[in-house]
Amino acid sequence: MSLLNSLLRLTRFWNLLIIGLAQYCTAGFLISTETIFDIRLFLLSSSTILIAAAGYIINDYYDVKIDLINKPERVIIGKGITRRYALLFHTLLSVTGVAIGFLLNWKIGVANFICAFLLWLYSNALKRLPFIGNLTVAVLTGLSIFIVNVLYPPMMVLVGIYSLFAFFITMVREIIKDLEDLRGDDTFGCKTLPIVWGIRRTKLFTYFLLALFALMITFLHQRSAPLPINFFAWSLFLPMVALVGWLVRADTRKDFYQLSQFCKVIMLAGILSMAFL
């Protein structure tokens, strides 16, 4: 396996493309089409992608032993890339991403620094705690969309809604991934929700999260500003209903893996739905 191929797999290249797409769609469709060719948007997206890539690397660095049980075929560190080079790439990507943020403005620079630190802390400790690790990743994902509005104020309700969407669907996906990785996590003493609560209660919690998202959007529609609620019904809510129906029947590792991939499809569909608003 070549070094380049190993790096692309280690940094989840396709996930990084989705992050960039989300930020460009947010800027172009929810804020202003004039932002698409703005160099500041390119720099913001680049810094976000670099920090996310660094996060994937450090996560795999700390998870090598667990991954050898849960997904041995996907382990890169120690095979395609040495642990020393993995740490080097993580540091370079993190520092570059934070530096680009400060070039844009101090608020984005500080946000990027906090994100880079939280990704390291998540990989080192938080992901082994019930709920806290899931919450951290979900907040960072929602922030990757919201930060576009920090670059291009004033604050917009639709950007906030899609940030919430990214937050909740990521939270659910992270919990489903914990269900998928139950055996390896338990072996190494991780205290994820499925281990602490059991599969049934963990599933119930994911249903609650999805229902809470729908209730929050309905509340905003009634109390804040009129929203395209019918559009959201089929573009955001309907896929979530399908997710719940599938999750109810899921009970094998393969089922949870497929559900995790379906969450990525829902996320991508949600991002693309911005183009139709």
Model-derived segments and spans:
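C-terminal membrane-associated helical module and adjoining short loops/tails
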Residues: S2-R9, W14-L17, S94, N124, ...
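Proline-centered turn/helix-capping motifs that create local helix->coil transitions or kinks
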Residues: L16, I58, Y62-I66, G184
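Small-residue-rich segments of transmembrane alpha-helices in multi-pass membrane proteins
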Residues: I18-T26, I77, L135-Y152, P194-V196, ...
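Membrane-embedded alpha-helical segments that form the functional core of polytopic membrane enzymes
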Residues: G20-Y62, G97-V98, F102, W106-Y122, ...
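Transmembrane alpha-helical core residues of multi-pass small-molecule transporters
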Residues: A22, S47, L93, I114-L118, ...
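Short helix-capping/hinge motifs at transmembrane helix termini and TM-loop junctions
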Residues: L30-E34, L104-W106, L126-K127, Y152-P153, ...
